[in-house]
Amino acid sequence: MWRSIFASFVFLHGVIHFIGVAKVLGINNHTPITQAIAKPAASIWFLTALLFLAAAILFLLKKDIWLLLSVAAIVLSQFLILSVWKDAKLGTIPNVLILLVVILSFGSWQFEKRYRNEVQIGLQCIKQVKPSLLTEADLLPLPLPVQRYLKYAGVVNKPNVLNVKIEFVGQMRQKGKEWFPFTSEQYNFFNVPTRLFFMKAKMFGITVPGFHSYKNGKASMQIKPFGLLPMVSEKDGILNKAETVTVFNDMCLLAPATLIDKRIAWTAIDDQNARAVFTINDISITATLCFNDIGQLINFVSDDRYEIGDKKRYRFSTPVSNYQNFNGYNLPAYGEALWHYPEGAFTYGRFNIKAIKYNTE
């Protein structure tokens, strides 16, 4: 809604600049501008109007180039306003308002660009790698319920997974607060364990971006309204271990082919449960995987994840359901994230897979 309102505002501001063109060309002698305008200035008024119109349209289309066009239009517009200050000084107000939105939008763009750059680095690192086929023999060291799960997921006789791109839509909340909607995109790379998660949440009527980065045991998390104001900023320490749990959770639920990884030590519990210890450098985390009779993974439970808000460790679980076929792989399309506090379980996240793709380039 606000996007349409702002685009209309910029568009109208651009149209108003045609008044200068009309004044110079004598098309309308009853314009609000009473001061004389030199004829060569007509082209500048016309160009400024077109820049604002183009910026408005590109803003609606979510094309980043609107930022550059807006800055150029504002500079030209303010130059023209100064040349006829007595009649056009009020035009400074919309220029300032548009500039404010440009600055805030540029901050968000720069913040997301950091994520995009890190994704490109990850993609470049595996560009020349050719994945081998995952075979039945690769499953033999795994506990039987894990073997059944990988067969059910459809990973056998398909390429090993080097990376995965996932798009989510869902909801999140904090304890004692209302749900807020979000969309997210993430890339995981598995040779050097990497998780790059970029989220856009709707909070307080605005889009609030968040970026989680995990690289080989080192984690950081930033949530920045407009990409400028640090609402949350955490790195290293207990976050490293907490996000190692998250990375392994992603492997189990979203990239089951990676469960043959040698950094995982498996222990069979029974026909429907298995325990795993996942180690990255000096960090080891433990999780229990729960399966049903047909081989589906239905829950992931770990006691090694920290709730960053209060720096305490609680049981963490992610029950999943609604298995669907994604490009030939059977994966859970819906999942929830729960903290198990002393007073009871609390669901803080609901995730729906919008799209998933392996070995992207």
Predicted regions and their residues:
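Gly/Pro-enriched, hydrophobic low-complexity segments
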Residues: R275-Y358
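N-terminal mature ectodomain segment of secretory-pathway/periplasmic proteins
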Residues: Q147-G227
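N-terminal trafficking/processing presequences and adjacent post-cleavage segments
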Residues: F111-E136, K218-D236
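Short, solvent-exposed coil/turn segments at beta-strand boundaries
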Residues: V161, E185-F198, G210-M221, I269-Q272, ...
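Flexible, processing/modification-adjacent segments and terminal tails
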Residues: Q222-I280
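Short, solvent-exposed aromatic-acidic interface loops
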Residues: K200-I206, K224-P230, D303-E307, E336-P342
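Membrane-interface extramembranous regions
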Residues: M1-R114
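N-terminal leader/targeting segments and the immediate start of mature chains
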Residues: Y115-K165
